[in-house]
Design a protein with these regions (language model features):
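Positively charged n-region of N-terminal signal peptides that target proteins for export
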Residues: 1-5, 9
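Exposed beta-strand-loop-beta-strand "reactive/processing" segments of non-cytosolic proteins
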Residues: 51-85
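C-terminal motif of bacterial Sec signal peptides marking the signal peptidase cleavage site
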Residues: 16-19
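Short, non-transmembrane alpha-helical segments in secretory-pathway proteins
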Residues: 23-56, 105-114
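A short, surface-exposed beta-strand/turn
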Residues: 79-100
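Extracytoplasmic electrostatic interaction patches
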Residues: 97-210
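Acidic/histidine-rich, surface-exposed loop or edge segments in extracytoplasmic proteins
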Residues: 21-25, 87-91, 143-155
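Repetitive helical segments and hydrophobic/amphipathic motifs
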Residues: 12-13
């Protein structure tokens, strides 16, 4: 009976005593806002010289594992990058290179695609990393940097159109780009075509509605 009472008291103590429960902030912070202010300090020391602007965490939160995540918007949301801070391990991971190179990347794609073609850069993906890739060409050719590109055509697609898609894909690949290209005529879509490959014209023309 005494043992049972002691066991109950120990259980109550674990519940009530501060620090005995799992704390996603590891006792370092009180809330997400405090973490955000701390991470703001870190990212400004690391990256502000590259962006020439004060960097602030937005859309942030902390998961149950104690990993704080946020999006950093740069130049009035012209581009952005993500950060993750592990509160317990005190480690920061970021894809800041994405934001740093994003504007130039879009310009590079725009200069590669003929003016006669309509397109949309649907996404630029970059795995979060501790390192910062300052060299643009190293960033583009990095295996973690991937683009998703959509090319638009009106109505029927000719063989010449399909060959133009092949040329665009080769040009992007020659520049070091990784990722995928897909064609759309407004209703139908081609296969998802991987950069670095030479797709068959028939696979490209699957977006044809005739």
């Amino acid at each position: 009976m005494i043992k049972r009472i002691l066991a109950v008291l120990v259980l109550v103590s674990v519940i009530l005593i501060p620090g005995c429960t799992k704390d996603k902030y590891s006792g370092e912070f009180k809330n997400d806002k405090e973490v955000a202010e701390y991470v703001d300090t870190i990212i400004n020391k690391k990256y502000s010289r590259y962006f020439d602007a004060k960097l602030c965490c937005s859309d942030y939160g902390t998961n149950d594992e104690g990993v704080f995540y946020a999006t950093v918007y740069v130049k009035d949301e012209k581009y952005e990058f993500g950060v993750e801070y592990n509160i317990k391990n005190k480690t920061l991971e970021s894809d800041a290179s994405k934001g740093y190179h994003y504007e130039k990347l879009l310009e590079d794609i725009r200069n590669t695609i003929p003016d006669t073609m309509r397109y949309d850069v649907q996404s630029v993906k970059c795995n979060k990393r501790k390192g910062f890739i300052k060299d643009y060409h190293k960033f583009v050719s990095d295996k973690d940097t991937k683009i998703e590109l959509m090319l638009y055509f009106d109505g029927s697609m000719s063989d010449d159109d399909a060959k133009q898609v092949q040329r665009v894909m080769k040009s992007l690949s020659d520049k070091g780009f990784n990722g995928t290209v897909q064609c759309c005529n407004g209703e139908y879509y081609s296969d998802v075509l991987k950069l670095g490959s030479i797709p068959d014209i028939k696979d490209i023309e699957k977006c044809d509605n005739e």
